[in-house]
Amino acid sequence: MTSERQKRVRNFSIIAHIDHGKSTLADRLLEETGTLTQREMDEQTLDTMDLEKERGITIKSQAARLIYKRDDEKEYILNLIDTPGHVDFNYEVSRSLAACEGAILVVDATQGIQAQTLANCYLALEHNLEIVPVINKIDLPSARPEEVKREIEDIIGIDASDAPLISAKTGLNIKDVLEAVVEKVPYPKGEEEEPLKALIFDSYYDAYKGVVCYVRVKEGTIKPGTEIKLMATGRKYEVTETGVFVPEYMKIDGLEAGDVGYITASIKNVRDARVGDTITEAKRPATEALEGYRPAIPMVFSGIYPVDGAKYGELKEALEKLQINDAALSFEPETSIALGFGFRCGFLGLLHMDIIQERIEREFNLDIITTAPSVIYKVTKTNKETIDVTNPTNLPEESEIAYMEEPIVECSIITPSDYVGPIMELCQNRRGVFKDMQYIETTRVVLNYDIPLNEIIYDFFDALKSRSRGYASLDYELKGYTQSKLVKLDILLNGDNVDALSMIVPEERAYSRGRQMAEKLKEIIPRQMFEVPIQAAVGSKVIARETVRALRKDVLAKCYGGDISRKKKLLEKQKEGKKRMRQIGSVEIPQEAFMSVLKTEE
């Protein structure tokens, strides 16, 4: 039996490509419904992290409860769940969408549909959400709302004839959006008498309350004092507080089927309350969990080391604190001959890695060195044993390897048709396999490629943007593994292997990559008192060499005229000294060297 109250609840999220105005629209909705006054408003209210505001991106999911009074005096409860728009956080998006019945699709009237818009839109359609298209930025002179409406109808196949035309910046027609949500988004179905089922769509650590779980109650009710069980981990807790977000926390007595809110239950670690897990009652558990849960799988690995070795403990503490709030971050200790003690960290993708590094440097004031990112390679040894390699230094000897496999991703790139040539060339250079291309309209194309993940994690995105003057957009997802001919490229300085610079590269690229790195390091490594050979090697075979010349003191300065044999003696003596120095000398490697390894010249 659906209660009257339930019929007046709407759960929705906002999906959009980066920079199409998602967080600004959320701000306007909060303002229009009087949830926050103008005075409390602040740009991007739901993006609470400094980093989110600075980069203008949303990283964590957030939620807010809006009370909307229609003209017929009925009050509606609208639960807005803000989702991240970036491809690294795809799983977070899918969990937030699973907590909703509808989604507002924001499309920029000047840019039209982009890759991420499509990807998130298909995610929403998979969850059977009602999609409400909204066209934003119509106050700009270059807006073309009618064309964009046609695009939405042609590509996604949803009716956009009565899509509200709004400007989130100036607050134009915001009321139409609220009306559309009430009209089009279905109310939540779910019985209050059934056993409890609630979906965790985000969790966050609070120093006083422990872990705060953001939940959407699908069936049943939950109140303080209920003993709950988490279905993925099997752990049991007692609920200490339930409430809703007005974006701040507001305590209420309980949550019923269809509600979105938070619960706390003295949970100590975010890992115990994983995003996507199902909460049920310990006494009367649900028979099966809500579908779609999967643990977050790191795709990209990188070593993080403190610049000052003594700060190892502080770095560990920083990572543990970040992990409390970010279940997708994984790390384990490792040592490197060149860099000392540090951690091998796993991330969802490059943006995630970048954000974690920046947060370590910012929030914990630590100077860190990061090594080149790498992916998980599956190595099958000659004795049929299979191992996963995330760090090139752990790769077995060449003679022990039967074959290696690397992860492949499916990429869809949306670009203006003028840039198809350069972009196809870029994908070809990155060992991409062309699948197909479709014209969205006469001027825009979707290109589908399968590309090895390790070709994307360096600087594919930058290269894509520069080839298309910033117009192309990219979306990718992991497809599986494929067998490839790969070798380990080592860098030797002064005859010593620098383990932190090792990398796994495709065999046919080893020579050019080695050549590039040797030349790059020659520019970066400062000249020493002795000459330093830089060698790139595969196995025991050196494939490229550069030499950093020695600095020399003018030992003949005080000889004037003088006898040639005297000069010879001094020069020989200098040569001897340099030789001895080279045997005992060690070379300082500047931080840029580790970073420059990543930038491959196209």
Swiss-Prot record:
<feature type="binding site">
    <location>
        <begin position="136"/>
        <end position="139"/>
    </location>
    <ligand>
        <name>GTP</name>
    </ligand>
</feature>
<dbReference type="InterPro" id="IPR004161">
    <property type="entry name" value="EFTu-like_2"/>
</dbReference>
<dbReference type="InterPro" id="IPR006297">
    <property type="entry name" value="EF-4"/>
</dbReference>
<keyword id="KW-0342">GTP-binding</keyword>
<dbReference type="GO" id="GO:0043022">
    <property type="term" value="F:ribosome binding"/>
</dbReference>
<keyword id="KW-1003">Cell membrane</keyword>
<dbReference type="InterPro" id="IPR031157">
    <property type="entry name" value="G_TR_CS"/>
</dbReference>
<feature type="binding site">
    <location>
        <begin position="19"/>
        <end position="24"/>
    </location>
    <ligand>
        <name>GTP</name>
    </ligand>
</feature>
<dbReference type="InterPro" id="IPR009000">
    <property type="entry name" value="Transl_B-barrel_sf"/>
</dbReference>
<keyword id="KW-0547">Nucleotide-binding</keyword>
<dbReference type="InterPro" id="IPR027417">
    <property type="entry name" value="P-loop_NTPase"/>
</dbReference>
<dbReference type="GO" id="GO:0005886">
    <property type="term" value="C:plasma membrane"/>
</dbReference>
<dbReference type="GO" id="GO:0005525">
    <property type="term" value="F:GTP binding"/>
</dbReference>
<dbReference type="InterPro" id="IPR035647">
    <property type="entry name" value="EFG_III/V"/>
</dbReference>
<keyword id="KW-0472">Membrane</keyword>
<comment type="similarity">
    <text>Belongs to the TRAFAC class translation factor GTPase superfamily. Classic translation factor GTPase family. LepA subfamily.</text>
</comment>
<dbReference type="InterPro" id="IPR000640">
    <property type="entry name" value="EFG_V-like"/>
</dbReference>
<dbReference type="GO" id="GO:0003924">
    <property type="term" value="F:GTPase activity"/>
</dbReference>
<keyword id="KW-0648">Protein biosynthesis</keyword>
<keyword id="KW-0378">Hydrolase</keyword>
<dbReference type="GO" id="GO:0003746">
    <property type="term" value="F:translation elongation factor activity"/>
</dbReference>
<dbReference type="InterPro" id="IPR013842">
    <property type="entry name" value="LepA_CTD"/>
</dbReference>
<dbReference type="Pfam" id="PF06421">
    <property type="entry name" value="LepA_C"/>
</dbReference>
<dbReference type="InterPro" id="IPR038363">
    <property type="entry name" value="LepA_C_sf"/>
</dbReference>
<dbReference type="InterPro" id="IPR005225">
    <property type="entry name" value="Small_GTP-bd"/>
</dbReference>
<feature type="domain" description="tr-type G">
    <location>
        <begin position="7"/>
        <end position="189"/>
    </location>
</feature>
<dbReference type="Pfam" id="PF03144">
    <property type="entry name" value="GTP_EFTU_D2"/>
</dbReference>
<comment type="function">
    <text>Required for accurate and efficient protein synthesis under certain stress conditions. May act as a fidelity factor of the translation reaction, by catalyzing a one-codon backward translocation of tRNAs on improperly translocated ribosomes. Back-translocation proceeds from a post-translocation (POST) complex to a pre-translocation (PRE) complex, thus giving elongation factor G a second chance to translocate the tRNAs correctly. Binds to ribosomes in a GTP-dependent manner.</text>
</comment>
<dbReference type="Pfam" id="PF00009">
    <property type="entry name" value="GTP_EFTU"/>
</dbReference>
<dbReference type="GO" id="GO:0045727">
    <property type="term" value="P:positive regulation of translation"/>
</dbReference>
<protein>
    <recommendedName>
        <fullName>Elongation factor 4</fullName>
        <ecNumber>3.6.5.n1</ecNumber>
    </recommendedName>
</protein>
<dbReference type="InterPro" id="IPR035654">
    <property type="entry name" value="LepA_IV"/>
</dbReference>
<dbReference type="Pfam" id="PF00679">
    <property type="entry name" value="EFG_C"/>
</dbReference>
<dbReference type="InterPro" id="IPR000795">
    <property type="entry name" value="T_Tr_GTP-bd_dom"/>
</dbReference>
